[in-house]
Amino acid sequence: MNNNIVNLVAAIVLSLGIIFGWQYFIVKPQQQKQQQQIALQKAKDLKKKESAQLEATPVIVQEASQAPRIKIDSNALSGSISLKGLRFDDLILKKYKQDLSENSPEVVLFSPSDTKDAYFAEIGWVSNLSSVKLPNNETIWNSDSEILTPEKPVNLFWVNEDGVKFLVAITVDENYLFTIEQTIVNNSNQELPVQSYGLINRKYTAVEKAVNILHQGPIGCIDENLKEYSYDDIKDKKSEKFSASKVDWIGITDKYWLTSLIPDKSSNYSSNFNYAVKQEVERYQVDFISPVQIVKPGENFSIKGRLFAGAKKVDLLDKYEKQYDIKLFDRAIDFGWFYIITKPVFYAMNFFYKYVGNFGISILIVTVIIKLLMFTLANKSYRSMKRMKNLQPEINRIKNLYGDDKARLNQEIMALYKKEKVNPVAGCLPILVQIPVFFSIYKVLYVTIEMRQAPFYGWIKDLSAPDPTSIFNLFGLLHFSLPSFLMIGAWPILMAITMFLQQRMSPEPADPVQAQVMKFMPLVFLVMFSSFPAGLLIYWSWNNILSIIQQYYINKLDK
């Protein structure tokens, strides 16, 4: 096969095929996606309560939101805890708005079980003996305070008719982590076989289906392995059970938000990812339950767990993972296949952001660094392409001589490459190396909360969203809306122009078919990239500009 065609397949079809694959998995109407982003990030419901037996199916319960409550107030959170059933079902993320509008409300994470977007977490005790009287979802707890703050913990208690006292101490830090210590004081004259449990319950509707570019749904680290199940996975299976396992954490993840239970590390747990339908509403639940613990008369038993409910900030998850030895906690952020590249790329962007205060500028700086690291490879690629073009007359002569003998033809061409010290695939290497970098930058822009609503300059108010302008309405001068496929903004156009100029600076492929295909690539990329995040277009445009400068410098060296 003609080696220029091999280059074409490797350098063009491969990269274009990957981009088409991305486009297939990405929700194309990006404007609608921005408007619906809140719905995708708001809490969904699920309603199931653990019964007295270990293997029993959780029961959907009904609870009024008009219950006595403890107020939550911190720099990051507001809301309340229901004293009826001890349920975390009212939580607002104070640092995040639902959209970019001036009067946008804050993001709501938790909502009570009798609301449209119900989403809550719950901890408690169950027993395999019905005679053991435990607090349940109807229990009204007593509290020593009406407000929970980072400076002021809350202590709850409830005493059953046998004199057994149940204590719960709750603290919250300055971010999104609750620490919950439960204690049983057995003042009765009988042994108490008890199990601690925790659950996260969520309502889920079909209109809020997640896109396939990242994981949304049940997630956890069980036996030091990351477990991810889509809503459809759990719906099909009805339940996914893990018996007597080491549970570091389980929860439900959204694109930017995470709710996770982190049980005490003193024992293994049985955990479940469940699905049920109640009154035509799909409900999902993740839960865990401990082994049976016997609390003898006159003895106390305590167990401590944690609840994370908030934004998936990279530095914050890293901090908790290290501080509390929570395995793979950072994997709640879906960095994808290129995790080992994507996370360092984020760290680099975040590092420069601390100094320049703009993630767009940070992207430009990181691109320069990547370009410098790849300069030697790019130089070799350019020289190889130039040699390939110079060898084209000799290759054509060999084709004329051995056109009917493919084995001899390939042998002679490879001998020519060896003699002239030319690597026929060297021209593809820079593109192949850039593919994981491209994926990584795209992932950083798409999944990290730090990039959400992060502005650049001018009309780019959100680097994680597409360029909101379009050439078809003269970039907003004509006031009418356009379908998503016509939203071809200024940055996609700049990317295509710089790509065209870069091609003009590079050696033209010797093969005429390849040369013609290359001429159309800027137009193809213009259409393909128009719905991608603006931050990615800024990266690609700047990368093209740097490539033009680099090519000019290499050309000067060759003279």
Swiss-Prot record:
Q: Which Gene3D superfamilies match?
A: 2.70.98.90
Name the job this protein performs: Required for the insertion and/or proper folding and/or complex formation of integral membrane proteins into the membrane. Involved in integration of membrane proteins that insert both dependently and independently of the Sec translocase complex, as well as at least some lipoproteins. Aids folding of multispanning membrane proteins.
Q: Which domain of life is it from?
A: Bacteria
Transmembrane residue ranges:
5-25, 332-352, 355-375, 429-449, 474-494, 520-540
Q: Does the keyword Disulfide bond apply?
A: no
Q: How does it assemble?
A: Interacts with the Sec translocase complex via SecD. Specifically interacts with transmembrane segments of nascent integral membrane proteins during membrane integration.
NCBIfam families documented for this protein = PRK01318.1-4, yidC_nterm, yidC_oxa1_cterm
Q: Provide the Gene Ontology terms for cellular component.
A: plasma membrane
Q: How does it sit in the membrane?
A: Multi-pass membrane protein
* Primary localization: membrane
Q: What is the lineage of its organism?
A: Bacteria, Pseudomonadati, Pseudomonadota, Alphaproteobacteria, Rickettsiales
The cross-references to InterPro entries, in alphabetical order and at most eight, read:
Membr_insert_YidC, Membr_insert_YidC_N, YidC/ALB3/OXA1/COX18, YidC/Oxa/ALB_C, YidC_ALB_C, YidC_periplasmic_sf
Keywords from the UniProt entry: Cell inner membrane, Cell membrane, Chaperone, Membrane, Protein transport, Transmembrane, Transmembrane helix, Transport
Compartments annotated for it: namely: Cell inner membrane
Q: Which gene encodes it?
A: yidC
Protein name (Swiss-Prot/TrEMBL): Membrane protein insertase YidC
Q: Give the GO molecular function terms.
A: membrane insertase activity
- Which HAMAP family did the record assign? YidC_type1
Q: Which GO terms describe its biological process?
A: protein insertion into membrane; protein transport
Give the record's family classification: Belongs to the OXA1/ALB3/YidC family. Type 1 subfamily.
